[in-house]
Structures are given as structure tokens and as C-alpha cells.
Amino acid sequence: MLTLFTHINSFVWGPPLLALLVGTGIYLSFRLGFVQLRQLSRAFKLIFREDNGQGDISSYAALATALAATVGTGNIVGVATAIKSGGPGALFWMWVAAFFGMATKYAEGLLAIKYRTKDTNGEISGGPMYYIVNGMGQKWKPLAVFFSAAGILVAILGIGTFTQVNAIASSLEHTFKISTRFTSLILAVIVLFIIFGGIKSISKVSEKIVPFMAISYILATLIIIAVNYNKIPHTFQLIFSGAFSGTAAIGGFSGAIVKEAIQKGIARGVFSNESGLGSAPIAAAAAKTKEPVEQGLISMTGTFIDTIVICTLTGIAILVTGKWLEFDLQGAPLTQASFNTVFGSLGSFALTFCLVLFAFTTILGWSYYGERCFEYLFGTKFINAYRIIFVIMVGLGGFLQLDLIWVIADIVNGLMALPNLIALLVLSPIIVKETQKYFSETKNITKP
């Protein structure tokens, strides 16, 4: 079974999709005048601006919800997995994916606001399925349907449930000897109570947990790096040389390792920051704003925080401790071992705490993404049926094989990204026009 899905994954995440993902980001970066560089400071200032339009939640709450879904096991387990199989060079390719992915995330956020609608319950609905149909026309509806179907699969079979629950359950079992099955069932009960409150309930939890968990984890990794400060130059040498010549803990010949570094780096980068996946604009659409460009700018900060900051710190912490070279360590235990070199036995507790928070908030965020995709296909009448299915899948998350879970997650991620990337390319003239109009009106010095 694992071998079959691994072959499917290699096909889905082959050169065409990787080229489309990075290529879309590169294309948008040039068309938008590298908005991710020129407007990053403005973007961070906008996060806490006063709400000025219709919507269900504040722009900050929308970003917190998106980050809740984005900052998850990919930042801890995914980075460790990428480095283990692709070597230190995988981290470089994660940076590449993130840099160009910021332009992609900007475009997604902009389109989410421009083409959002209200559902029959009076709540805001938006995301790729809406900007595909409302922006590209009804003839493109099959693409919107395909995206929504893939989004449901990602939510209930990939990022939203299995990978997160399995990471929480495995970590708690490793640290506290708690049964994975017991953990899965408890998580299912907690999630049940929260997701039935909808986006407002999810965003309230996210607003409180996300800043705390991110700051706690960043401080912990900075301490590890500071203790091993003398190894930082060599670590960066490994990252840059490994990106083009290949160095992996698992061995193999150079060409294959470089290919693995590129594939794992970009795939894990997308898994982590979700740029191009089409998930974040679903949350962005609910923001109380009337300006698409401003929400686009806010959205792209999510990729910066997730990958350029958190994933980078995870990767460097693993590399400076040298634990990535130990053959029997992979996934969460590899990151855990790196923490233990500085914090001793407390390292396991600290990482477990962070991992549980990261994964739990991702479950909440993805429950909403899947719900909106489900609503697009089946209407609001059957939303509770989706929520029950989602909770059941959470309960099953601790029963599956880790390797198989990650492979399935990668496959459905790729299927979800494809229709969204097509939409971004087709709608790129509108993205550019909206961007030029906004910066012209605000008298920005440099127009894209």
C-alpha cells in the first residue's frame, strides 16, 4: 500500500507541478514588481489596522485562523523529514518556495476579497472556488468543483486531520506514554465542541493560541541556536552547498540527493505555508475589509511567519545540534532530540507542548476550510454532516502509519493546488490591475 501511494505521490509531485507552483510565484513576483519585498513592512502594519468593511471576523482574526491552519506539524515534523531525506539543502528550497510563495499568497488574498459572496446563512463565503466561477465564468465551474472536492479530501484525509492527530498522539505517547487511541478520541471530543461554533468560534480560539504558541516556539529554537552559535557559519555552508551538490543523512548519490532536496524542500514548504494550495484565501475572505489589496498584503505575511521564520529556526536548530546525522531519528523525534541537547529532558516536554498546540490549531483551521468546500458543493443544509465526518476522522488519526499519512497528505495537497494555480494565472491581469490601482490611489512611490 505504501509503495503504491509513494509512486502516485512521485507522479503528482513531479517536475510539472513543482514547476507550476514555483513558476506561478515567479511569474506573479515579476508582474507585481516583487510586492513581497517592497510592501512587507506595510503588510505587517495593516494586520492591526481598524476594520473597515463587511465580513465575519477582523483581518487579524482571519490571519490568525490562516496561521492556525498553516503553522502545524509541517513546521516541526515536516522540516525534520525534509532535512533527513533531502539533506540541509532542502531548507534552501523551502526558502525559495516561500519567497515566491509570498507573491502567490498575496494574489490569493486579493482575489478572495474581490470575489467573495454571502451564503444562505448570511455568512461570508470565499476562496478559489468562488474566484474561479465569479472571476473566470461559469464555464470554469468544473475546476471549482474539482478544487472543492480536493479541499474536502485535504481536510479530512490530509493536513486537517490525520497528519496533525498522528503527530499529537505519537508525541504524547513518546513523552508521556499516553495511548495514541486515547489521545485521538479526546481530541475528537474537544474539536467537536469548537467547530460547531463556526468561524467565529474557531477564530476566537486561534486569536488566543497562535501568538502564544509561535512566540514560545521561536524563543525555544533561538536558545538552541544561541547555545550552538559557533556552528552557525558551517550550518549555512551545509544549506547552500547541499542545495546544489547534495548532502543527506540517509546516503545516496549526489544527483539523486539534489533532486530529493528540491522535491522535499518545495513539497514540505508548500505543506507548511500552503502558498498556492488555495486554503488561506478561504479564511481571508471572511475578513472585515473592503480593500482586496490590503488583505492580500496581510495574507502574504502568513508565509513569511510560517516558513521564513518558524521553519528556518526549526531547520537551523536541527542542523547546529548535529542530530540530523543520527540514522534512527526522523520526524518529531529528530526535532525532539535537538531540543534535548540544550534543555535536557525538559526539551521533550517543551517540544511536545508546542507540537500539540501547532497541530491542534491546524485541525481547527482546516475544519473550516473543508467546511467551506463542502458548503460549495452541497449547500449549508448538510454542514453538520460534514462536521460529524470531520470529528470521526480526527478520532481515527492516531491509528494509522506515519509514512502512509504523509504520502497521502502530499498527494491530496497537489490535487488541491492544481486548479488554484490555474485560476491565479488566468486571473493575473486582474490581480495586477487591482494592485496598480491601489498603489496609485495611495500615492505609493514605486508602482508594481
Kindly label every feature range from the protein language model.
Residues L17, L32-Q36, G74-V79, A155-I168, ...:
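Transmembrane helix-loop junctions in multi-pass membrane proteins
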